[in-house]
């Protein structure tokens, strides 16, 4: 072979190598640009644009763990869990030691209700780094959501040992302890969670419920009042305060609290339903005509709304029966039985109204529906009454 030909071949090889190297550099630059563009889109919460950018990056590097991870996370943020699952599985297959991929894949499985798989993935993460309080918390949460309360306690305690200021972990520990009937310890954990984060509404709500269940009325109502102050946009928070007063017989305080709620949330039907409920209970307990009139006044407007709930209509029907307006009560209670979700006692009170009006067949049908829906253990009296109504309708 002549020297010229050798030189020519060598030059061609060098040129090809240069072109190849340049293309590789250009491809790497474009890959990095697309990754950066996807990250920037995510900071603006533009998940669709992020997915487009990361897909472009994957077109350049199909075996990029990073691009699969980022696209999977983008799908997760959009709620497209099946697509997220696919990408995150690929990311963990490409790099089994990538802890972020393991965490996100665990999160997606947990969001899909696949708690056993989530537990496995969080454990794989912890095998690499066993001092990650957030992952220990997620492991405990996955156990808790799958109903394995005992198994949940250990990882949550370890999470707290690593980060004692992790308020959500203290709250989760309280839920686990409550599920195991360890009420004093649960209340202590809730107290610690609120000490760390006074705005943690779910913990305050749980502590209020436990206080009230333990007969600590003052403490429970104080927690509910604090919750109402923390979440002023939610009328049900102040309603819960009023109903708590009513349950312990403090009708005046209940009415005053619900009156404040009515002033603050004049368009919220749930406020008037609660007021009607309190006044009706007082009317029934004390045969109080004034309380009955106020119950009807509170419930009438709420029941007239097109979207009135079955519960509201049932309360209104009960008040009408008590006031002697049986015909109107029957009509309202018939309507209550057609609204989903149905309040089962609507059928019981409809049977009462229909029977009073001499509509034995309608009363029998309503009572039969109530018996079918009711979870009362002793139904003997009800079945006896049903038999009597069935005999009268023949």
Positions of PLM-derived features:
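Alpha-helical segment of the N-proximal tetratricopeptide repeat
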Residues: 30-60, 70-73, 77, 107-111, ...
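Terminal, low-structured helical/coil segments at or just beyond the last alpha-helical repeat
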Residues: 356, 364-394
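Structural signature of tandem alpha-helical TPR/SEL1-like repeats
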Residues: 45-53, 77-90, 100, 111-124, ...
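Alpha-helical adaptor scaffolds
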Residues: 277-284, 300, 309-324
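Helix-start (N-cap) detector for alpha-helical repeat units in TPR-like alpha-solenoids
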Residues: 31, 65-66, 99-100, 133-134, ...
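Structural marker of alpha-solenoid helical repeat scaffolds
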Residues: 60, 94, 128, 162, ...
């Amino acid at each position: 072979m002549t020297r010229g030909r050798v030189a020519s071949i060598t030059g061609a090889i060098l040129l090809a190598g240069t072109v190849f190297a340049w293309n590789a550099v250009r491809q790497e630059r474009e890959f990095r640009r697309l990754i950066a563009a996807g990250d920037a889109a995510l900071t603006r919460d533009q998940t669709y644009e992020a997915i487009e950018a990361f897909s472009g990056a994957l077109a350049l590097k199909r075996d990029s763990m990073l691009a699969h991870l980022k696209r999977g996370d983008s799908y997760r943020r959009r709620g497209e869990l099946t697509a997220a699952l696919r990408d995150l599985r690929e990311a963990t297959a490409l790099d089994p030691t990538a802890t972020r991929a393991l965490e996100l894949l665990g999160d997606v499985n947990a969001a899909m209700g696949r708690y056993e798989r989530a537990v496995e993935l969080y454990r794989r993460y912890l095998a690499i780094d066993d001092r990650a309080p957030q992952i220990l918390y997620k492991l405990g949460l996955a156990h808790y959501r799958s109903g394995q309360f005992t198994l949940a306690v250990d990882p949550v305690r370890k999470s707290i040992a690593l980060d004692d200021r992790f308020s959500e972990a203290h709250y989760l520990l309280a839920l686990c302890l409550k599920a195991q009937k360890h009420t004093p310890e649960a209340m202590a954990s809730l107290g610690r969670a609120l000490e760390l984060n006074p705005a943690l509404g779910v913990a305050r709500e749980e502590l209020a419920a436990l206080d009230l269940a333990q007969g600590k009325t003052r403490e429970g109502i104080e927690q509910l009042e604090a919750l109402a102050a923390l979440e002023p946009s939610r009328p049900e928070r102040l309603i819960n305060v009023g109903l708590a007063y009513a349950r312990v017989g403090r009708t005046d305080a209940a009415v005053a609290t619900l009156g404040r709620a009515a002033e603050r949330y004049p368009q919220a039907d749930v406020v008037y339903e609660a007021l009607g409920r309190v006044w009706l209970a007082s009317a029934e307990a004390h045969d109080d005509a004034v309380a009955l009139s106020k119950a009807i006044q509170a419930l009438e407007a709420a029941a007239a709304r097109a979207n009135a709930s079955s519960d509201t209509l049932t309360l209104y029907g009960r008040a009408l029966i008590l006031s002697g307006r049986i015909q109107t009560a029957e009509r309202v209670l018939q309507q209550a039985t057609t609204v989903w979700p149905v309040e089962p006692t609507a059928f019981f009170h409809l049977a009462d109204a229909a029977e009073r009006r001499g509509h034995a067949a309608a009363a029998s049908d309503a009572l039969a529906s109530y018996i079918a829906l009711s979870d009362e253990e002793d139904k003997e009296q009800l079945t006896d009454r049903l038999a009597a109504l069935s005999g009268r309708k023949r």
